[in-house]
Each structure stands twice: as structure tokens, then as C-alpha cells.
Amino acid sequence: MQFKNALTATAILSASALAGTNSTTSIPSSCSIGTSATATAQADLDKISGCSTIVGNLTITGDLGSAALASIQEIDGSLTIFNSSSLSSFSADSIKKITGDLNMQELIILTSASFGSLQEVDSINMVTLPAISTFSTDLQNANNIIVSDTTLESVEGFSTLKKVNVFNINNNRYLNSFQSSLESVSDSLQFSSNGDNTTLAFDNLVWANNITLRDVNSISFGSLQTVNASLGFINNTLPSLNLTQLSKVGQSLSIVSNDELSKAAFSNLTTVGGGFIIANNTQLKVIDGFNKVQTVGGAIEVTGNFSTLDLSSLKSVRGGANFDSSSSNFSCNALKKLQSNGAIQGDSFVCKNGATSTSVKLSSTSTESSKSSATSSASSSGDASNAQASVSASASSSSSSSKKSKGAAPELVPATSFMGVVAAVAVALL
């Protein structure tokens, strides 16, 4: 084994401190590998096979056909398996705890990785594993999970996790389903650019800080009550959204470019703390699932081909408002009444249907109502037409996968005031 630091007593103590070990028994010197060590052959791993605990960061790389860590139950440090072009399988079924990270990256023929007893790890990073089909753990505690650019068909190794900081699954083209026991996500939940018909179930999830879903076919959030920051559904093939337990979104709520979405039910949602955007959902003709929303802390934009928009409980919008339907059956009457009562507190109010247009520049008292035409502007000042600028929600990923996005959201148009708020919402989701 090629040690990067000599096994002096000082190095051993330093490695133990860095790993934060709480062992009450001394670790044999042969099991303390210094700050880090690299194994390039199974023979290197066999030298520590008699250890129940190793102290330090272990890297496995080089021309190994298969590799195994026998007997080791704990790594007080990180385990990295990296850039091994011939490694086809790896097993470490005795390991229960890794105090640092488990990193598996750039393993082009690795088909299986087994950590059958692993219950606790700080982070798991699985990136660029183009041949892997199985990954197993007994994971109970982890802070961060990133799975990107793999051929996994399922991620059952994470199915029993209750809490995480980050859960990011992207660009796994064969991944078609995932059922999670997560109850809270303290930073972000992101799912994007996976299989064509991906179905997700997060029915135990009660609280999350941020959620962004892209390229998903079906989603279930049976218990979700609060999203502390932003919630976005972008470029999905979802036929419906049912978040009937959700009562609050602390910042932005975006439902953008979901071409097959025909129903959105948010029947207990009362508060959106930032921008509220429903845009370019071509099959969403009746929008009646937001009838309990009372306050919107930013701008509101609803655009599409809808004939019904029920915001009957809305009392306050602290930004501007843009309602634009291509359907001549949509009526602006209720929204104009909302504006005349002073509920719209931003700098502009625009409401259009297929036949008429009403726009108000709220920094002045001018109001214009006119029949729409193919060439006429919605507002003589031009501010209202700027309010139709679309929201940017282009799909993004953290990997080098060549998979193309299933759809592209409109381009972000820089603007001030009302649209500045809308743009900020979109940028926050990227």
C-alpha cells in the first residue's frame, strides 16, 4: 500500500483527530493509515483485512478487476473508489459506518457495488458510472446524496433514509421509479433528466427547504405540509399534481412548461412567500386548485390557455400581476375587482383573454381597456407588454451526460420591477 504520509505516531494521532473517532480502544498501527492511503491492487486491501476499524482516508484506484474490503466495519475517514477502468465489481459488506464520504466516480465498467451493512455515512457521491446496475446498502443516516450519470434502474439503497440535507438524482437514463421514506430535506431535493417515464413517491415527506422536479412522469407527495423556500415543477410530463396537504411555500412556487398537466390540486395552500408562476402548461384549462391562497409575497404570473382561474381567497399580492389566457372564455372581472380593491401592490396589473385586454400601470392612475388584435400592444406605455416576458426554467444538471432535455422553458428576459421579481424566482430554481 502506498502511503502518502509516513506512519509516525504524530500522523496517526492527527488522522484520528481529523476523523473524529470516538473509539475507546486503541487502533493497531497497521489499521491507522495516516491522513490518506492509496490501494491499487487487492493485495493492498488484504493488508488491512484484519482490521475492524481503519483510521484515515482510503482511495482505491488503478487496474483492479474486482475488489473487496473484508472484515472492516468502520472507516474513520472517507472511502474513494476512483478512475479504475477495469474494476467491474466492488464489495464491502461488513462496513457499517463511514464518518466521511463514500465517493464512487469514473468507473466505466463497474456493474455492481455492495455495501450491504452500511448504515451511516456523511455523503454519498456516485458520478459517471455508465455500467452500474445494482447498488445496495442498509443506509439509515446520511447528510448528502448525489447520484449522477449512472445506469441504475433503481436507487433502493436509499429507500429507508428519513432525513437528508441534499438529495440530488440527475441524468440516470434508466432510472424509472423511486419510492422514498424521507421525512425531511433540510437543503434541497432535486430530481431531473432521469428515465423517460420516471415515477416518484415521497409520501412520508412532511417538510423540505427546496424542491425542484424536472422530467418526471408521476409524483406523489401525500404528506408534504411545508416548503420553506422554493418549489418548482418544470418540464415534466405529469398529468396531475396533488399536493393537498401543502399549506405554505416560503418563497417561490413555479409550475412551468408541463405539457401534459391537466389538473393541479393545492387545496390547502394559503401562502406563497415569493413569486407565484403558472406558465405554459398547455393542457391546464381549468385552474381551480389554488382557491385558498390568500397572500403572495412577490409577483404573480399565470399564462396559458385556461378558461377558469379560481383565486377567490386571494387578498394580497405584494408584487405585480400578469394574467394572460388565449381563451376567449376566460373572464378578467374577478381579477379586475381584486386590483381595484388595492390587493395588487406592485407596479403593474395586466389581465388578458382571447378577446380583451386590461392593463394598469399602478405607479400612475392610467387604465386602458381595448380589444386585442394581432398587432396592437396591451399597453400604450409598453410596461404591460414587458410583463409578458416568459420565465426561464431550462433544465440543468451537474453531470456530463449527453441526454437532452425533454423540453425547454422560455428564455429569461431582463426587466425591472414586476418582471425582475419573476426573473429572480426562475434563477433561484436553476
UniProtKB/Swiss-Prot annotation:
Membrane topology: Lipid-anchor; GPI-anchor
Name of the protein described by the UniProt record: Cell wall protein ECM33
PANTHER family, per the entry: RECEPTOR PROTEIN-TYROSINE KINASE, SPORULATION-SPECIFIC PROTEIN-RELATED
GO biological process per UniProt: cell wall organization
Residue positions the entry lists as glycosylated: N22, N57, N83, N197, N210, N228, N235, N242, N268, N280, N305, N329
Similarity annotation: Belongs to the SPS2 family.
Native source organism of the sequence: Saccharomyces cerevisiae (strain JAY291)
Lipidation (GPI-anchor amidated glycine): G407
Location, primary (coarse class): membrane
Compositional bias of kind Low complexity: 362-402
Chain positions covered by the region annotation Disordered: 362-411
Purpose: Required for proper cell wall integrity and for the correct assembly of the mannoprotein outer layer of the cell wall. Important for apical bud growth.
Keywords annotated in UniProt: Cell membrane, Cell wall, Cell wall biogenesis/degradation, Glycoprotein, GPI-anchor, Lipoprotein, Membrane, Phosphoprotein, Secreted, Signal
Presence of keyword Cell membrane: yes
Propeptide: 408-430
Gene3D superfamilies referenced in this protein's UniProt entry, alphabetically: Receptor L-domain (3.80.20.20)
Signal peptide: 1-19
Cellular component GO terms, alphabetical: extracellular region; plasma membrane; side of membrane
Domain of life: Eukaryota
Location(s) in or outside the cell: Cell membrane; Secreted, Cell wall
Protein modification: The GPI-anchor is attached to the protein in the endoplasmic reticulum and serves to target the protein to the cell surface. There, the glucosamine-inositol phospholipid moiety is cleaved off and the GPI-modified mannoprotein is covalently attached via its lipidless GPI glycan remnant to the 1,6-beta-glucan of the outer cell wall layer.
